[in-house]
């Protein structure tokens, strides 16, 4: 993997060279045109530069002093105006990259007395979190103890608490990054679970006490391996990684690559499974390299005239994160030292439901279907949206390039949306009685019920109605059947279902990435008790709101009812949609 290591380091150096000029004298980060900086960006920059130092041992880049740049970032991130928990956690690990203690840390020596006091005050503040922010507490605890700011090491206790809460909130022992609001349903089982374990493992690697690291790795492995085992089933043949939930796109590649490399370094992968994971790693990296890296100019692109990302992620931050990960991959690859040129593993058929939670209150998970003969490969998530009101967590078959959705906008893609007054409902986010099995003619099915309808923001609406959902999968044909009932007579104000027609990025894509063939998505409505109609096709090619993480959405086909309808108790209302897409490839 030495060539891979060198390639990663070259890319990291190129990305940093293009972005360190954005670090101002006061440590703030200048945004790209048409973007706004985030308060946590100095921390992300500090960690990227710290990882570059760990990978190369060099304290200069493009004639600039890295130690000086990191000290400026710390000054900005630790003051009152720019302080954020995530930014502080990233800069903590960036600081530790230059030395495990105050006495042997060039960046600490460079900090002014005021900045040291601010940093100490921030690191010593303790707040207990029940969501993803708890991993930032772990990073702060590592820095507190390693830098001698606290004689008591709380790292182990915080890791134990993090793992205990996973067991309390998930019967499947997956991480739930639940929303702060009590009104929103919990169960945000998305890529933040992968990120959490990658970040904790990274923090432990920088801990001054290697014995603590050795004690905690086995318990981390118990939970992290669940995600590791998911990756071969989730990653598509063209290398596309995690494709549902928040913060995907480029991050959906980077986080998965990091988890696999960490697992290889720690010997978590059995020898007989190594060829499979090497193949997954190769595909993930190739997709990342060809889809998101501008190889001519040497930087990461997450937004342009054809694609987009969530507003919570800026291009500048993504570039620093990419540089950080590339430096880590370079180091890990050197440590692993294996040959990465493994043969491609034959694709196998998959039909499985992975249960994240099966409590008395709700059931959540993801249904994965792959048919090697037809190239159909989809994930159908049944997970909470956290506070993110977008399409990425909706319960439809996620197949970028075939069934697309906008990166940062809500649309009821391939599933019905029923509006009752102020309540806009979706058959997503949770279910009860989730079942899967084999149906007629070797088809597979995934079924669930919603005893209470839920709105698009993730709030359950008591006493309105219920929904039964059944998806069947056979070859490349998918059929979704939705049956609605109401408890009392109610007026349905609006009904719609949206089909988005998109394409991969015209320039940045792997040759075998999925794209629609001449026959399109093969959409048909087989049953409709709502008496809706297809509206005129909307052309959205030039609208920046309708860009996915991977390419542009060109058209929207909306199936809607344009007038009110009275729904009565005791009557079932069914809508059945069939999909038989023509799966082709970009080249």
Predicted features along the sequence, with ranges:
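Short coil/turn connectors between adjacent alpha-helices in alpha-solenoid helical repeat scaffolds
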Residues: 50-62, 96-109, 147-153
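Extended polysaccharide-engagement surfaces of secreted carbohydrate-active enzymes
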Residues: 237, 253-536
